[in-house]
Each structure stands twice: as structure tokens, then as C-alpha cells.
């Protein structure tokens, strides 16, 4: 099993990094391509394990899929309607196949998904939304099965709670429904806006994405088109935190400050000099004191849960006392005991972690437990004294495109080993 071997240094991380396209936009966009009847081309797609799995799934459904820079999908030849367990067992995003399949073909089934072990991520909201659009849902032998006679029907849907995944499922399915769908209490993440932009390029009529009310006027068919995936705001934030905790200066290219305003505000509060341009962001921590910040995760435009682990590390290395409260997912502090193995000080109370500042961390053997936690462990290894081995890095490969190469370009001593 592959690992990262990191030799820590007190040398700051300095340089430029090109940010990849957002996994959390690329995945729903690739699944949404099932809705189209003509070829689509998707650019700026990151090279990730989940992307490879999704491309393989689309092929299994009968689509023609290739990658030559951009990802090309011809969904006109789809003739299978089941996403099998052997393909989707490691990837919860596979639930996004269900809405497009039932919307276009009147049927679809998806094995109940896997993915990160960070608490309950129920598919109930996806199922309820599809039922409100007229689909009949059954659960059999570990599969969610959706069927409808004719077309789905537009509806007024009020989501019980804000859910990025369910917002995408309902929006995609409603694109081919008969009539208009109004989705209230919708999630507002940039990746939802990007998915809506993609669908509109194919001929969908979606308005309001990025607000809490999305309106979808159903159309009879979607054609082909080209789209470039939005920048990954979480990868951006991860490298900016790496600059901050190492006392360095990093410029992130191919990204935009409006995607992560809450994160940039907290970096400034932590003492960093933050500058932004049209397609770049820089954080400069040279000769500045790192200060702890208090954070409460929240749906967009609040502070993203996917940046919580990185800021937990920041608080551990900062002066003062910062309190981080996790409101989105349960059981999302599994990185804390691993960081404590490296000498960090922290106390977990329910859904809150309180960090004490330490002068330095020491290298240790640690284990990645989920995607974002693994990133915080790798960054911790970069600034620790001695050698850190990060095990189970398949987690990080699910969400970061060549993170070791990008960190090495900033001066980190990191290599992938077996």
C-alpha cells in the first residue's frame, strides 16, 4: 500500500502552484452528461481516482468515454441503467447517476455508495427529491432503484436541510422533467453553480443556482456542448494554509478569491497577508506571527467543512486559543489524534476541538482517515522535525491531483513510497 514519506523542515514553503479543477464540480458534471443525447467535452478535469471510477462507470453504462486533455463523453449509446457495487463501492458520488438515468431513460439503479468514513451521509434527501418529481423508489439487495412511467413531473420542493448532493440530484433530474421545478432551501456552493452552467450550455433552463431558490424549467432533450470545470477551492485553501503554517509565501494560480471568501477572511484574521487577482490568490506569512482563529463550519457561503482539518492544524501551530466547531458532519475530528501523535495539543468536546499552541511538531507514523484529514497530516509532516510517514494515502488520491509534486515544487521534501 502506498504511503507518503515526508522529511520536515523549518524552511518555509515558497513558490507557485497551479490549482486543478474542482472534484466536487467535475464529478456531478460527468454524471450529468448522462442527460445529454449528443457528445460533451469537459475541460479542466482533475486527475483523480474518483474521476477514473466515474469514467469507467459511464463506459459500463454504454457511453463512449475518452480523455485527451479534456474528457469527452458521448452518452448517445448508453444502454445499461445500473451502477454496480464493484465500481461504486468506494465512491459515494455514484448516487448522482440515479437522477440523470431515471430522468432520461425512465429507470436507473445505483448500489448504495461508499466513500469517506466521516459519519452518516444518508441518501434520503436524494430519494425524497426524486419521489417528489414522480419517481418510484425501491431499495433491494443494497441497490436504490428509481422508475417512472413517461417523464418526471416538475414540483415545488422544499429541502428538509441544506444538502449539496441532493440539490445536484434534484436539479439534474428536473432538467428533463415536464413542467417547472422550484427548489427551496437549496445549497449554494460554487460547484452547484458550475453544474448548472454546464447543463444550461446543453440546453437546460436553470436559474437561481448559487441562491437558496433554484428554478428549473424542464426541457424535452439536452444536446452536446463544451465546459471547463471551476477551480478547486478546497485545494486552493489547502495550499494557502500550507503557506501560513510554514511561514512562507504561496501563489495559487488558476483560481479565484470569490470561491473561498470565508477561508481568506480567516487567513487574514490569522495574520497572513492575503492578495487576490483575477485568476490568482497569494498568502504571505513571511516574518508574521500566526494567530489562532475560531471557526464554525457552515454551508456555503459559510466556512467550508472541507477546510476544517487544515485550520485545526493551523490553530495547533498558532498563538492563542482557537475553537473550531464542526456543524456539518459528525465524527470529523479523526485527524486530531493523529496530529497529537506528532506532538500537537488538542481537546475534543463533542463537535468542538480546542487547540493548544506548540513550538513544533515531531515526525511520526500517522494514518489518513479521510480525504481532507490526510491533507492536514501531509502538511504537518512538511513542517515537523524529522520523518513523517503518512499511511493509507488512497484517501488523498481521491481528492488531490499530484499533491506531492505540487508540494515538492514549493520546497517540501516529500515522496510516494510503497
Curated annotation (Swiss-Prot):
Modified residues (2-(S-cysteinyl)pyruvic acid O-phosphothioketal): 116
Entry keywords, A to Z: Cell cycle, Cell division, Cell shape, Cell wall biogenesis/degradation, Cytoplasm, Peptidoglycan synthesis, Pyruvate, Transferase
Taxonomic source organism: Vibrio parahaemolyticus serotype O3:K6 (strain RIMD 2210633)
Enzyme Commission (EC) number: 2.5.1.7
Pathway given in the UniProt record: Cell wall biogenesis; peptidoglycan biosynthesis
InterPro entries: Enolpyruvate_Tfrase_dom, Enolpyruvate_Tfrase_sf, MurA_subfamily, RNA3'P_cycl/enolpyr_Trfase_a/b, UDP_GlcNAc_COvinyl_MurA
Binding site for phosphoenolpyruvate: 23-24
Record CDD domains: UdpNAET (cd01555)
Family designation: Belongs to the EPSP synthase family. MurA subfamily.
Subcellular localization(s) per the UniProt record: Cytoplasm
NCBIfam families from the UniProt entry: murA, PRK09369.1
Pfam families reported in the protein's UniProt record: EPSP_synthase
Function: Cell wall formation. Adds enolpyruvyl to UDP-N-acetylglucosamine.
Name of protein: UDP-N-acetylglucosamine 1-carboxyvinyltransferase
GO biological process terms, semicolon-separated: cell division; cell wall organization; peptidoglycan biosynthetic process; regulation of cell shape; UDP-N-acetylgalactosamine biosynthetic process
Catalytic activity: phosphoenolpyruvate + UDP-N-acetyl-alpha-D-glucosamine = UDP-N-acetyl-3-O-(1-carboxyvinyl)-alpha-D-glucosamine + phosphate
Gene Ontology CC, one term: cytoplasm
Recorded superkingdom: Bacteria
Family matches, as Gene3D superfamilies: Enolpyruvate transferase domain (3.65.10.10)
Coiled coil: none
Amino acid at each position: 500500500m502506498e504511503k507518503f514519506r515526508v522529511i520536515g523542515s523549518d524552511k518555509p514553503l515558497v513558490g507557485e502552484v497551479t490549482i486543478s479543477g474542482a472534484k466536487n464540480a467535475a464529478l456531478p458534471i460527468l454524471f450529468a452528461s448522462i442527460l445529454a443525447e449528443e457528445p460533451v467535452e469537459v475541460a479542466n478535469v482533475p486527475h483523480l481516482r474518483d474521476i477514473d471510477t466515474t469514467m469507467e462507470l459511464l463506459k459500463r453504462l454504454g457511453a463512449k468515454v475518452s480523455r485527451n486533455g479534456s474528457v469527452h463523453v458521448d452518452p448517445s449509446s448508453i444502454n445499461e441503467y445500473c451502477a454496480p457495487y464493484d465500481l461504486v463501492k468506494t465512491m459515494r458520488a455514484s448516487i448522482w447517476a440515479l437522477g440523470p438515468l431515471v430522468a432520461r431513460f425512465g429507470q436507473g439503479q445505483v448500489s448504495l455508495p461508499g466513500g469517506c468514513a466521516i459519519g452518516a451521509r444518508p441518501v434520503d434527501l436524494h430519494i425524497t427529491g426524486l419521489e417528489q418529481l414522480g419517481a418510484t423508489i425501491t431499495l433491494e439487495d443494497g441497490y436504490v432503484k428509481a422508475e417512472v412511467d413517461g417523464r418526471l413531473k416538475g414540483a415545488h420542493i422544499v429541502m428538509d436541510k441544506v444538502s449539496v448532493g441532493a440539490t445536484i440530484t434534484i436539479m439534474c433530474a428536473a432538467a428533463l422533467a415536464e413542467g417547472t421545478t422550484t427548489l427551496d432551501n437549496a445549497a449554494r456552493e460554487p460547484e452547484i453553480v458550475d453544474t448548472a452552467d454546464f447543463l444550461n450550455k446543453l440546453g437546460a433552463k436553470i436559474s437561481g443556482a448559487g441562491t437558496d431558490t433554484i428554478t428549473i424549467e424542464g426541457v424535452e432533450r439536452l444536446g452536446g456542448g463544451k465546459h471547463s470545470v471551476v477551480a478547486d477551492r478546497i485545494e486552493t485553501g489547502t495550499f494557502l494554509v500550507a503557506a501560513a503554517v510554514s511561514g512562507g509565501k504561496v501563489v495559487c494560480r488558476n483560481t479565484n478569491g470569490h470561491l473561498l471568501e470565508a477561508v481568506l477572511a480567516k487567513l487574514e484574521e490569522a495574520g497572513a497577508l492575503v492578495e487576490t487577482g483575477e485568476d490568482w490568490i497569494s498568502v504571505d506569512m513571511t516574518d508574521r506571527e500566526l494567530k489562532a482563529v475560531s471557526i464554525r463550519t457552515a454551508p456555503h457561503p459559510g466556512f467550508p467543512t472541507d477546510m476544517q482539518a487544515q485550520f485545526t492544524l493551523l490553530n495547533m501551530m498558532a498563538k492563542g486559543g482557537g475553537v473550531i466547531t464542526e456543524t456539518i458532519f459528525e465524527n470529523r475530528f479523526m485527524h486530531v489524534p493523529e496530529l497529537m501523535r506528532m506532538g500537537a495539543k488538542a481537546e475534543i468536546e463533542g463537535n468542538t476541538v480546542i487547540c493548544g499552541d506548540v513550538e513544533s511538531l515531531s515526525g511520526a507514523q500517522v494514518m489518513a482517515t479521510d480525504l481532507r484529514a490526510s491533507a492536514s497530516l501531509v502538511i504537518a509532516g512538511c513542517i515537523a522535525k524529522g520523518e513523517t510517514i503518512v499511511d493509507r494515502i488512497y484517501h488523498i488520491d481521491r481528492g488531490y491531483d499530484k499533491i506531492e509534486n505540487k508540494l515538492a515544487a514549493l520546497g517540501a521534501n516529500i515522496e510516494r513510497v510503497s
